[in-house]
Amino acid sequence: MNVLNKEVFNQTKKVLGLIVSNKLVNGFSKQFKSYMFQSPKFKPIVSTDNDDKKMIYLCDTLKKETDIPDQLKTFIKENDIKVIEKDISLNYNNFSYEQVLKTLLPKDVGIPFSFERIGHIIHVNLKDEQLPFKYIIGQAILDKNIQVKTVLNKVGEIDTVFRTFKIEILAGEPDLVAEIKENECIFRFNFEEVYWNSRLQYEHMELVNTFKKEDIICDMFAGVGPFALPAAKIKKCKVYANDLNPSSVKYMKENAKTNRLESKVEISNLDARDFVKSLVEKSIPFTHVVMNLPSTSIEFLDVFRDIFLNSTIPPPIPPPIINCYTFTKLDESSDLIKDTIKNVENVIGAKVPSDYVCYEVRDVAPKKSMMRITFRMPTILPYVGSLTTASTTTTPTTSNTNTSTTTSTTSTSTTTTESTNTNNSANNVEDKNNKKRNSTEDSNETNETDSIDTNKKLKN
């Protein structure tokens, strides 16, 4: 059974009809709507041969007059309404998506209700037991969703370096170039050539809302720009965006032009590590790093470890705030947040500062979650810019006990800033969508170059 047979739904039903005066129709519709015949694209109120009266069809559960509830019986009697039996004709168009698939699929095959909408495209992930009926499911989705032109199914897992996957068109046109509006920006791209996930729309804006106008953003795995373009358009940030996929870069450039952001977004097509190194070599003081490649993002933290922890040469920029998305598997004895932090620390070879923010973005599979961890990259060296003013600048740094002050001098090249980072506070952290979010003990740290402004990071 691979083709949807619409003729199966051609049928005639016997229902009760009421001949109602025109002046009573509106009142009847409001008071007794639940008793009227309800079906997609079916009009339960129709004209009659008498211009002063309308026919109102009752729901098919009221098969005879004795089935009519007392309240409706009273209304019928008081207004001298005639009750008759009528035949109505129904076809495929009069049945909902769920009704169609309940009719056509075996009882032990579930109906897919969860799918992603990308412009005119609907993307489904069918289960094994649904695959023999994939074309029926695809056609039903196409027919029952307005403005949808293409229905496709993912074939296999995301296993390419560009995060793309093989697809199969189940119904509709083979047009995979979609255009959508998200977070005040227009995005256009070929869904087969790039990575896009509409389910992350809220998370895209959640992170962008932590940025300020003066921030400079380094987006290492930018895709077609779901973080980069809103950061530039809504927050007016300067953005350096990169992706290894030439198709992503092509569409990101087009999208930047469409949204008039060419002067705010500089786009590269490099390996992510080379991209970061190029910005550092140019002394571009990016303040936030976005790392949205959950399967391998954490591995790329080594580029920051080499710049801020392993190098003997002071970096030309201050340590940025890292916003890293990653997948974390949850075993019975483990904790998502603790495991995420541990995975980060294993790569950077240092403790994550105590003012980190870490929470679960969404479940992606049983015992596997997409996480976001935000922290300032620790360092053991002052950046070059701080050395030029060290002899004349005094930076008070108050410890947790409020008893000590550290003064910067030209001999501070060996000063450890990691220890001050661990005293920073994470205030006003909300519980987003009842998911875990963690920040540790408060302190009075005031060194702006070493602490994360959590009022900037999270909504109060």
From Swiss-Prot:
S-adenosyl-L-methionine binds at residues 204, 243-244, 271-272, 292. Keywords: Cytoplasm, Methyltransferase, Mitochondrion, Nucleus, S-adenosyl-L-methionine, Transferase, tRNA processing. SUPFAM superfamilies: S-adenosyl-L-methionine-dependent methyltransferases. It holds the Pfam family TRM5-TYW2_MTfase. Its EC number is 2.1.1.228. GO terms for cellular component: cytoplasm; mitochondrial matrix; nucleus. Residues 390-460 are annotated as: Disordered. It is an enzyme of class 2 (transferase). It is found in: Mitochondrion matrix; Nucleus; Cytoplasm. Specifically methylates the N1 position of guanosine-37 in various cytoplasmic and mitochondrial tRNAs. Methylation is not dependent on the nature of the nucleoside 5' of the target nucleoside. This is the first step in the biosynthesis of wybutosine (yW), a modified base adjacent to the anticodon of tRNAs and required for accurate decoding. GO terms for biological process: mitochondrial tRNA methylation; tRNA N1-guanine methylation. Monomer. PROSITE patterns: SAM_MT_TRM5_TYW2. Residues 442-451 have a biased composition (Acidic residues). Its main location: mitochondrion. Transmembrane segments: none annotated. This is tRNA (guanine(37)-N(1))-methyltransferase. Belongs to the class I-like SAM-binding methyltransferase superfamily. TRM5/TYW2 family. GO terms for molecular function: tRNA (guanine(37)-N1)-methyltransferase activity; tRNA methyltransferase activity. It comes from the Eukaryota. The gene is trmt5. InterPro entries: MeTrfase_TRM5/TYW2, SAM-dependent_MTases_sf, TRM5-TYW2-like_MTfase, TRM5/TYW2-like_N, tRNA_Gua_MeTrfase_euk. It catalyses: guanosine(37) in tRNA + S-adenosyl-L-methionine = N(1)-methylguanosine(37) in tRNA + S-adenosyl-L-homocysteine + H(+).
